[in-house]
Amino acid sequence: MNVFEELFSVLAGGRVLDAATGEGGFIRVLHKHLNNYTEIVGIDCSGRMIINAQRKNKNHKVHFVQMNAGQIGFKEASFDTVSIAVSLHHLENVRQVLGEMKRVLKPGGKFIICEMHRDGMTEAQFNAIRIHHWAAEVDAALGTLHDRTFAQAEILDYVDELELYDVITREIQGINTDPLDDKTITSVGGYVEKYLQRAGQISSGEMFIQRGEELRRSLHEKGVQREPLLVVIGQKP
């Protein structure tokens, strides 16, 4: 039994909001592992992401809306479950988004946070973090918000501020995969290539390009594994 199955299979999701949903990847996790749910609504500020999410998630109980998670356009206490996954480090104001999610969550409802962190990594996981941080710096240089990965303690500080009860935390290490798996190397290598092209758009971007080329070499020498994930579930008072 994996961590998601362990935690989610006992949950009746009811009406679910997935904030900063991107292309709806975490919604597919919820759909697979929740005991049941009546509806899942995914919101994201990017229209392109919403279009991709709709294309990748063909389910009559799953809907997508273009919406800023910092100003959620739903009534107070209108969802039974809220979730946000691998998105905190993309947010301009983490507290505002989490506060909005708590506002639309019903009392007693479940608040789910799943976020990568940078603690206790293998060398291959460290490669993933280095690539992620480099890409974040390239995005920042081009005016796109993309912050560095949080430490686990920083994530838990945000959770503490929400004042949830019956909080459960689990960690997914992500080290049960071959760091030199050809498919993974090809996929991550494509990500690096995309950001090398973006780095070429930066005035005086030679430093970014040099670092990207070093990361590409390290990727093929040492491999890559997914960063550790912290999964948190709590209830709103």
What are these regions (language model features)?
Residues 1-14, 29:
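Conserved alpha-helix/loop element of class I SAM-dependent methyltransferases that forms part
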Residues 17-19, 23-71:
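Class I SAM-dependent methyltransferase SAM/SAH-binding core
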Residues 83:
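A conserved beta-strand element that flanks and buttresses the S-adenosyl-L-methionine
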Residues 86-87:
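Short catalytic micro-motifs in class I SAM-dependent methyltransferases
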Residues 95-107:
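A short glycine-rich, Lys/Arg-flanked "PGG" loop and its adjoining helix->strand segment in the class I
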Residues 112-136:
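Conserved class I S-adenosyl-L-methionine
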Residues 147-163:
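Short alpha-helix
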Residues 165-237:
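Conserved Class I S-adenosyl-L-methionine
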